[in-house]
A protein has these predicted regions:
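A positional "C-terminalness" feature that preferentially activates on distal terminal regions of long
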Residues: 1-202
């Protein structure tokens, strides 16, 4: 067992095109500092969850995996195992250090931007749109996107958008000049790739 100290200065990164970045944010591309202490067993990060795999747990584990891959670029083979009530753990395999840095820097930068401007892509909705994790659907007339957005929508979202998924689509078009699906793909496609690598490594 080891504890990895993460102390990273992140610049640039893979970010979606958002029309308000240059006009509404002050110094949006300044370097960002990420610090953490992450426990690993060899080259594996283990995350335990008593419930089924959730999009938030998957995303948090992915961020930790990227962070250690960047913090220790000379070590290869980093992976994460999410152990849930399912029979098999969910395995994610990290990309190479440079690609991991690019993805991580983009995620951290968008998280920082979203503290100043609305970024309308919560985890459950993104996972539903990309079919990474499908939400519970009460009946066949409710789409996966609507079911995911219903789970995400709360009092924090209410001032900006209703619980109707079509309103989220409208907000994305008006505020971000893009679609929810495009934002979801930006967030989730690298995770899908890491899951595919994990299944091949079993």
């Amino acid at each position: 067992r080891q504890v990895i100290d993460v102390n990273l200065e992140l610049t640039d990164g893979d970010v979606p095109h958002l029309p308000w970045v240059d006009s509404h944010l002050t110094d949006p591309y300044r370097p960002l500092l990420l610090t953490d202490r992450i426990e690993a067993h060899g080259v594996t990060i283990v995350r335990m969850s008593p419930a089924n795999l959730s999009p938030r747990t998957l995303l948090e584990t992915w961020l930790r995996l990227l962070a250690v891959a960047v913090a220790q670029p000379d070590v290869t083979g980093w992976r994460a195992a999410v152990v849930t009530r399912s029979a098999n753990p969910e395995i994610l395999v990290a990309p190479d250090a440079q690609q991991a840095r690019n993805i991580l820097a983009g995620l951290v930068r968008v998280a920082w931007w979203s503290s100043q401007q609305l970024f309308p892509m919560p985890a459950r909705t993104a996972a539903a749109l990309t079919e990474v994790i499908l939400p519970y659907r009460p009946n066949r007339w409710v789409t996966a996107a609507q079911a995911g957005w219903t789970e995400d929508h709360d009092s924090n979202w209410s001032p900006f958008v209703s619980a109707d998924y079509s309103d989220l689509e409208r907000l994305c078009r008006q505020h971000c000049d893009t679609s929810p699906l495009d934002l979801a793909r930006w967030l989730m496609t690298p995770i899908t790739t890491a899951r595919t690598r994990g299944r091949r490594s079993r």
